Amino acid sequence: LLGVPILIPMAWSMMAYPVMMATQRMAATPLTTAFIGGWLLASWDLFLDPMMVGEGYWRWNDLGWVLPGIPDIPMQNFLGWLLSAIFLAFALNLLPRKAANDTVPNTLLIWIYVSNVIAAAFFFGQIGVALWGGIAMGLVIFPWIWRIWSQPQW
């Protein structure tokens, strides 16, 4: 799919639902939802790309500017995914909403966050990935966790 392994769109599809459930609960407008949801999806990619490079799925000849601790991924890759994620989140936010129990998507989102930080740091020895991904996702995850615990929807 345009040089992207099919696993990536499948993973993003799996992640899109819990991200949208979380960001729709946090944001007041569709545009805010798109930016917050886009940030959360793209920051998750900070964990994915180093794994994909490590598995040999892709590499860049001209890295340009990179984040310290993530030397194999050019920053323009993150920016491209960020724009794609904002567009995707905006489009998904246009779909009709219906009331749904958010326990499963909430659990999935927390599990993905925690497991990616732990896996990057301890299993793959990628401390920079754990820090950048953990901080970037944490900018949304921690306020969202505060929101769901302080304002439960029953």
Regions found by a protein language model. Give the residues of each.
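Aromatic-rich, lipid-facing transmembrane alpha helices and their immediate juxtamembrane interface loops
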Residues: 1-154
